[in-house]
Amino acid sequence: MTTATEKQTLGFQAEVKQLLHLMIHSLYSNKEIFLRELVSNASDALDKLRFQALSKEDLYEGDNDLKVRLEFDDKAQTITLSDNGIGMSRDEVVTNLGTIAKSGTAEFLSTLTGDQKQDSRLIGQFGVGFYSAFIVADKVEVYTRRAGLKPDEAVHWESSGEGDFSIETVTKEERGTRIVLHLKDEEKEFANGWRLRSLVKKYSDHISFPVEMIKENMDVGEEEEGKEKAEPAPEFESVNEATALWTLPRNEIKDEDYKEFYKHIAHDFSDPLLWAHNRVEGKLDYTSLLYVPAKAPYDLWNREAPRGLKLYIQRVFIMDDAEQFLPLYLRFVKGVVDSNDLSLNVSREILQNDKAVESMRSALTKRVLDMLSKLAADDAEKYQSFWDEFGRVLKEGPAEDFINREKIAKLMRFSSTHQDDDKQTQSLEDYVSRMKQGQDKIYYITAESYSAGVKSPHLEIFRKKGIEVLVMHDRIDEWLMSHLNEFDGKHFQDIAKGELDLGEVEDKEEKEKQEEVSKEAEPLLNRLKEVLKDHVEEVRVTHRLTDSPACLVVGAYDMGVQMRRIMEAAGQALPESKPTFEINPDHPLVKKLGEEQGARFEDLTWVLFDQARLAGGENLKDPAGYVSRLNKLLLELSNAG
């Protein structure tokens, strides 16, 4: 190293300061992961160099023996980890080591609770990478030179993990990055050969590159009498397998190896929920190793967030986040795909239109769905934990993936009137198996919450007849059902939309009685239409209600309350539509309504109409008018008493 130049002291981005503080306290019990994170970063840097050197071989600078080296000094209490990978320029150091260039960082930090165990999992999912060094070190130094830059354009970065860091230009002959950790006094146990070797074996055994350490108990050899022993040049040896895990036969891989490899590629602290490792030969030749995480990441609902698999071609790393191999509704899946068919100079644009990629995408999608189907069949409890984490994302599937619509539908779970809580545990196959004799439709209702759904007046006739209704209370559900028309040959029907047809569950006498009641109520229906004429499409006698006086029903193809709210929140224009007002002639309030005249009839009509709106989960357009009319009626009632 030569004399440093252009030394600057810069402040960390506010989010980095907050993350460092939280991480050091939340991850203390899992502190040994710092080595896994740093080795993973070094492995990524080697991958990137190898990829960029495909088109620019001089980046190797005459050294294509790619490796990670790990050294320690127990007296100085330091650990040094170096790689001869792509390295960083000065600007890259400031960006990568001084800021968090991730969307949603502020939102993520706001989700942290202060609970050490919970925050540890969340921070692990977010990906702490380099900053994990500060769990065990009170000072960290980084020396780095980007491949292709001159030796005197290297950078020295230093920080104690508090509010700022220093950066200066130095000379570094070899490309790549060297990180020096100055261990805290209480963490000096890590400056130990056996400890470091065991951590590399535990966490980084199956990364694609060797992690080397100095051979222990080196035989220095005998020296001539009277001469001092010469200090031998250190010999290094690989302390990991350095074989890409997915290239090994499945019967040679332990579950623990699969779990640690997942943590390496996903930067997750938790074990995966399940995985599938497959080799495909024939028309296409590729290997895939796919993982389903145990917990949803913090940015699951950000559809623009980086996603996808790590892509390798003939064992050469090509890119992270290759989203072309799985559909968006499976964006939670992590893993590796290694193809022998694609060209090494492939780009994201080429992947977009490659027929081999389309075939692989189709096969990998089927692989994930089959993996989930098997889990659902073999371990209902474990599958339920998957659904609780990722179910709402899987509900995007029927709209995106017509070919696999039925398979996705079988994986779905819903709440229903068959149960007493809001847990989504009922499959469509469960529902069909419990259908009443003569029932030919799958009935459902969408609502803002489970409680609102099960208390909806639209359910009354179904309760009376013992017909199960699915209660859909996720925001996505109404949109989902616009793309899911039938299951197992049975059509879906939203019980709050259109005409209600219970099919053969109703006998002929009931239908004839309903027609008779409708005729008798015609005078009242006409009077109601006159009052509500600008606000309703129709007024009719209900077939749904047994206990409530009235309800609102939207047209069979109109947008429901749930979907209208989503569109309103997104600032989108809503299509004009008017509901149908249904009354229950047997209800005492409706009978009383039929006896009223003039202003009192109008007031009572509007009160019933607004109550039907509220019961259906809608907001009132004129809440003050409703309160005024209701108070007026209550006052009259109290005076009459």
UniProtKB/Swiss-Prot annotation:
<comment type="subunit">
    <text>Homodimer.</text>
</comment>
<keyword id="KW-0346">Stress response</keyword>
<comment type="function">
    <text>Molecular chaperone. Has ATPase activity.</text>
</comment>
<dbReference type="GO" id="GO:0051082">
    <property type="term" value="F:unfolded protein binding"/>
</dbReference>
<feature type="region of interest" description="B">
    <location>
        <begin position="349"/>
        <end position="565"/>
    </location>
</feature>
<dbReference type="GO" id="GO:0016887">
    <property type="term" value="F:ATP hydrolysis activity"/>
</dbReference>
<dbReference type="InterPro" id="IPR020575">
    <property type="entry name" value="Hsp90_N"/>
</dbReference>
<dbReference type="InterPro" id="IPR037196">
    <property type="entry name" value="HSP90_C"/>
</dbReference>
<dbReference type="GO" id="GO:0140662">
    <property type="term" value="F:ATP-dependent protein folding chaperone"/>
</dbReference>
<dbReference type="Pfam" id="PF13589">
    <property type="entry name" value="HATPase_c_3"/>
</dbReference>
<protein>
    <recommendedName>
        <fullName>Chaperone protein HtpG</fullName>
    </recommendedName>
</protein>
<keyword id="KW-0067">ATP-binding</keyword>
<dbReference type="GO" id="GO:0005737">
    <property type="term" value="C:cytoplasm"/>
</dbReference>
<dbReference type="InterPro" id="IPR036890">
    <property type="entry name" value="HATPase_C_sf"/>
</dbReference>
<keyword id="KW-0963">Cytoplasm</keyword>
<feature type="region of interest" description="A; substrate-binding">
    <location>
        <begin position="1"/>
        <end position="348"/>
    </location>
</feature>
<dbReference type="InterPro" id="IPR020568">
    <property type="entry name" value="Ribosomal_Su5_D2-typ_SF"/>
</dbReference>
<dbReference type="InterPro" id="IPR019805">
    <property type="entry name" value="Heat_shock_protein_90_CS"/>
</dbReference>
<comment type="similarity">
    <text>Belongs to the heat shock protein 90 family.</text>
</comment>
<keyword id="KW-0143">Chaperone</keyword>
<feature type="region of interest" description="C">
    <location>
        <begin position="566"/>
        <end position="641"/>
    </location>
</feature>
<keyword id="KW-0547">Nucleotide-binding</keyword>
<dbReference type="GO" id="GO:0005524">
    <property type="term" value="F:ATP binding"/>
</dbReference>
<dbReference type="InterPro" id="IPR001404">
    <property type="entry name" value="Hsp90_fam"/>
</dbReference>
<dbReference type="Pfam" id="PF00183">
    <property type="entry name" value="HSP90"/>
</dbReference>
